[in-house]
């Protein structure tokens, strides 16, 4: 075969070729190398990191314009980063967070804004309790096997929210909860998939929290260092600017071709790119029908990440920490976090433009986006200082042809039960990594490490270096970032929903009326 001759002549023979130089692909390559396996990583971009990307310049020192956050229970990425000599620091929430709704700012502390209306409180409480309870039915490694999988997969998350919530207040916040966590709209995503997504991130409180949650920490120096330091370890085993165009496993060895017509030969392939990008590669033989269908049906979320830098952290003058939850259709940003450096230098606020808003605001000039964001911060924080930033950075992930969007791919209704079970299934000697294939913290850097190392162990099993039972490995808890168990009060567990309250009121009214009738007509004894 001509390709085989080219590969042999060039001497490009490896045990494994990894497609994709993000955290998942590089985690796989690192583990394989530790077992003495010859590996080559082919990365399409001129950098490693995938959906993590640390920009460095004189204005910001360093800034994560992609994935950045880590927290308790994310033990694999914490172990890997520690091994690479990368430290974490806590995102600042020492001062008060703020909720902005209907043109007013409400300071608060804790994971979720407080609700003072008693009916709305019952609705909120029932919403979080219901999402968590439904999630308990869903196996993290096989959500399509949940008892109610077919029913829930036919529903959008909007339909489920509208079914659960009685008040506009709870419904509006629930829609925002979907936007923030998966950068897509409630009407776009399967209820089954979203319930699974929240469950495998530890539940509604863990996924949404800063303290003791998914956004507790960042890396000193930026998350891009994880991939960069693995690349340093691997040396010339990583090739940048090498988009893979062909994978041919029709012969004894697999032949890989890149866009610049270089050829590489290997025994196994690990595909560590977003599922939809697999469609850019020509396979021989063709991919199985279910895999081919799956990769056409998993769109990427939409987000523009925006960092606004100021001379000083003026928000702290009002005892605000910089975290804002913004419920306003006209507001460009939906949620913010303090992005000041751990030593207090370079004060900054990070904000996300999410889902429908990312699409809408991407059409505007960068300076107009910047102006709108500053005006919003001035309103929410009640300070004209917000109008005078010293620098602005942004990253529209929808423009990235080798990502397609961020944070992660999502499952529209009907896809998980029909095609989801093939997400990790090997195709011949091709194995699949990427955060979308993880079973815990999928969509995060943690999920990327889990998926990459699992795919590496699948290959190691094929090479006879590990047993099948060692493919899935339990990760011990991080001693440096221990998790605190999330508990709920008696009232949170037992308060009725709004509909439950109405039933109680209706029953009580009926009993009272019946008693009155019986008493009036002397059917009850009188004392």
Curated annotation (Swiss-Prot):
The modification S-8alpha-FAD cysteine is found at residue 406. It comes from the Eukaryota. The chain crosses the membrane at residues 498-518. It is found in: Mitochondrion outer membrane. Its main location: mitochondrion. Residues 519-527 are mitochondrial intermembrane. This is Amine oxidase [flavin-containing] A. The gene is MAOA.
